[in-house]
Every structure is written in C-alpha cells, then in structure tokens.
Amino acid sequence: MTEISLIEVYKIVDSFFKYFEGNFLVEHFARNYYGKRGFKRYLSMKDIMALNIYRFFMQFSNLKAFHRFANKYLKERYPNFPNYEKFLKATNKSFPMMMLFVNSVLAKNREKCAGETIHFIDSTPVEVCKNNKILRHKVARDCASRGKSTKGWFFGFKLHGVCTADMIVESLTFTTGSVHDSKMAQKLTKDIIGKAFADAGYQLKSEVLSEMADDGVFMHNAPGKNMNRLISKEQLDYIKQRNIIETVWSVMKGRFELVYTKARSLKGMFRHFFYSIAAFLISQSACRQKLFIPD
C-alpha cells in the first residue's frame, strides 16, 4: 500500500465528478449538499470528500482530531476552513455521494478484472461495540445483531466481499451479524465469471450451485468438519490461498480503521465505514488518477 497526497486524492474525486457529469443521481446529491437554505458551504463537495478520504491515509480515525489537524496545517489550501460543526454537517451531506463513489470504484475494478477467472470470497465481522456493552449500545441497536465468527461472538455487522488473486476487491456488501455467509454467495458473485473459492461456511445446496454454474460461476469451498469429500490438488491449493482476502480485511481494519465503536449516529457510523473503504480502494494500484478516465 503506497502513500498518497491530498492533491492525488482530490484528482481522483474530481475525475469521478467529471466522469459522471450530467448523471441524475450525482446532480441530485450535489443539489442536496449545497441546498437552498442554511449555512453557506465554504468547502465544495469534492473538497469534503477528498479530505475525508485523506484522513484515513493520515490514520485519523477520529473526525474531530482530523479537523483540528486540517484547521491548523491545511489553512493555506483552505483559508475559509469551517468550524467542526459545519465540517461535520458537510461530511454527513456528502455520504450519499460517497456510497456512489465506492460502488463506482468496485464496478471499475470488475471491468478491469473481467479476464480474471480466480476469485476469493469471505466475510469479516464489523463490531459496533464490545461484547460487555451490548445491552447498553443504542446507536445500531435496531439494525445490528449478534453473530459468530472464527474468533467468537460479536455484535454488529458483517462485511462480505470478493477479490481477485491480486487483492483487487470486486464486490462488497454489508449485512447484519446474524446473516449466514452462504446466503450472500449468489449476490456477491452475480457480476463475476470463473471459479470462486471460499471457506467451509459457504456450503451451498446443489440447486444453488447449478444456478451459479449456469451463470458462469463455479463455487469451491473448503470441506467442513466430518465431511468426506474428494477435491483436486488444484482446488486444495486455491482454497489454501484464501488468506489473500483475509489480508484485505486485515489492511482495511488495521491500516484504514474500518471498525469504529464511537459513532453517535447510524449515519455517522456508515459514513465512517464507506470513507474507510474508499481510502482502501484508492490505495490499491488499480485505483489511481486514471480510474475514472476513459481508456
């Protein structure tokens, strides 16, 4: 993962806006951001998005701490830098556009990896609080749930994903913590073609496997406990390479601070998740300034 400057991040965001110029959703989100009433936006949506992505490269998991840093050291670039309250409101207003940005990057990744035939599927828990605070947690009480991973029980969400052998993420989706991995396999692989390798949690019924095979996706998963099933050496080798997508989760959580347990609102929580994911996607070699520039 290479370092990146604020200017580079801004160029990527700017190319995204130019690429989708005239798009109804983009124009709608932009109108909603600036609004007709309320306080004046001293920073454009491009600036807000670039700054919020950049803060994860600077490893500021706390938005207020990053605001203090930006207000002090980025004053030359942003002379009219808003106070924290206005910065927070502008950041929340940019959240719908950031969701569109992340989905657009994933779509571009799938385009660039169209020739790939090997894919890895996995999920990772995204805790919203520690287990001893579950009964007191209020922010995500109505949508988060208890789940169990290989490390034990947790309360929160699951992030399901697909990546290539080169760690290029092709698809991501959030579910509650109680959703079984196997229920997401078809949805995750609907836009890819080739062989998909997963752990024993992705045991699927033969009817589902047949439907996926008709769509060009051939699912291979590690055998569960007490299961006697023959698999080829090639399949076994690829199943053992599932640590590729586990490395993706490790980098997202360690380098880009995906897990966040101090959110004060559900919108603020998912805003943090999506900006963290956006920073990770940009950090990948396939996602530089030419991402939204036609070939």
Feature map (PLM): residue ranges:
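Short alpha-helical elements
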Residues: 1-295
